[in-house]
């Protein structure tokens, strides 16, 4: 049997196999737990069939150049916990990001803005002045 004959048999069999295969779609996400930076959160995982979202959750606290803490979590989820939350309290922030395509959670969720030391000092000064004016 010649190579051409083998190809004539092989190609239709391959085509039939490909057309008959059930297409499997598995979401792939990056995953990590309680990490301090995004470089440690680039581990790819294959999500379970029930998972429809890649999620990124981050929380940070600090002011000025003082970092009081930061944590980053990524993974697969059957639900989006909340549609892209960015809660910024000045000295602390919580962020969540959901997406539905493979490896879409590559980036870390935003760190949020942290208050500057002069801004905190001004707020404290104005609060003290207001208290002094209100006292009898």
Swiss-Prot record:
Molecular function per GO: acetylcholine receptor binding; acetylcholine receptor inhibitor activity
Organism domain of life: Eukaryota
Glycan attachment residues as annotated in the record: 105
Keyword vocabulary terms for this entry: Cell membrane, Disulfide bond, Glycoprotein, GPI-anchor, Lipoprotein, Membrane, Signal
Biological process (GO), any one: epinephrine secretion
Location of the protein in the cell: Cell membrane
Description of the deletion phenotype: Knockout mice show embryonic lethality at 14.5 dpc. Lethality is due to a critical role in the trophoblast stem cells which form the outer layer of fetal part of the placenta. Alters syncytiotropoblast-I layer I (SynT-I) fusion while SynT-II cell fusion does not seem to be affected, indicating a cell autonomous role in SynT-I fusion. Konckout mice specific to immune cells are highly susceptible to the murine coronavirus, mouse hepatitis virus.
Protein name as annotated: Lymphocyte antigen 6E
């Amino acid at each position: 049997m010649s190579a051409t004959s083998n190809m004539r048999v092989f190609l239709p069999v391959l085509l039939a196999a490909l057309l008959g295969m059930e297409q499997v779609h598995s979401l792939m996400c990056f995953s990590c737990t309680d990490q301090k930076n995004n470089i440690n959160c680039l581990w790819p995982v294959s999500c379970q069939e029930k998972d429809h979202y890649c999620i990124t959750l981050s929380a940070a606290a600090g002011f000025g150049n003082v970092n009081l803490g930061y944590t980053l979590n990524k993974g697969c989820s059957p639900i989006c916990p909340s549609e892209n939350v960015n809660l910024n309290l000045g000295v602390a922030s919580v962020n969540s990001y959901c997406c539905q395509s493979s490896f879409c959670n590559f980036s870390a969720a935003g760190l949020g803005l942290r208050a500057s030391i002069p801004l905190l000092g001004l707020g404290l000064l104005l609060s003290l002045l207001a208290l002094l004016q209100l006292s009898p």
